[in-house]
Amino acid sequence: MEAKLKHFTATAAFLITVLLLVGCAEENADTAFQVYLERLGRTLDLGSQTRVPHESVARPPRPGKLRLKIPADTLNTLDFMDLRGCELQVTIGKTNSSLGRLARDSQKLLLALEFLHLAPACIDYLTAAGELELAKKLDQARRQKLELLPSLIFNATLASEEFQAFWRPAPVSKEYPANTSSAVITALEHINQASARWLSGNYLADNQSFELQLSEVSGGDGGQLWRALLHQGQWLDSANAKLEQRGPLCTATRRPQSAEILPNVVRKYFIDGIQPRAAMLGRRYHQLLPPLFALEHQLRIKLPANYLGWSES
């Protein structure tokens, strides 16, 4: 009898502990969806078994696979020495140095913009000085740089390590996207606006600001947003499948009790439980990605096939 009493006491203590801990279960990004599907299953008499989705987010090709080939400059060292009297001489010297040849794509773009900004004045100077052949060669180099400008912008932005990091998938979190900021959005907007200026013939650039903007992009949440939207879509597809599996609740002669309960389930567990975060995800999408899509549109004639294949997947 004493043994049975001890067993009963231990069992009761265990059950009380479990009941006390039920409210302490940590909520995650799946919780609201699981509760909604379980309530749907009970209401529609379809069972409450749910399967947590395992979303797979495609990552863009690595920067080395995306980078567009940039031909070497047409101006050789002899031409560079002949440019005395032009501010452009310093820019060409930096470009042709060992550091210039090994520079990051962002620095190569900034040097090209500096070249395009300074070249017209140097061409005018050489022409006035009677150096017509050299002026002609410099103008040819300017035209080459101008033709390569979209490729240089692509290499420094969409094909860069910073944008690769932007698309890095992160675990789905219930705090997302409430825990984000507007800094990366501002950076993307500035990069897109600067690219538009450069492509329209205004080659001035704030080198430090551009590098800081790229750094901000690298900490952005493009991959996290993509995964969160995919995660949400898979859960809602499961909910829709349950509704389709059940079919119409009412007939001409019968209205079951579940027809009275279902609107309350949808209101409490979908409209109140899921929709607020879904709306936040929608807002984040429409704030974060439009400047990036606009940049892609500006560079569309230079986007390589592997980038297009990834972005359209």
Q: What positions do the PLM features span?
A:
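C-terminal motif of bacterial Sec signal peptides marking the signal peptidase cleavage site
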Residues: L20-G23
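Extended amphipathic alpha-helical interaction segments
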Residues: D139-L295
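N-terminal Sec/ER secretory leader and immediately downstream segment
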Residues: E27-N179
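Hydrophobic membrane-insertion alpha-helices, especially the h-region
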Residues: A13-T17
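Bacterial N-terminal signal peptides that target proteins for export
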Residues: E2-A12
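Alpha-helical oligomerization segments
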Residues: R283-S313
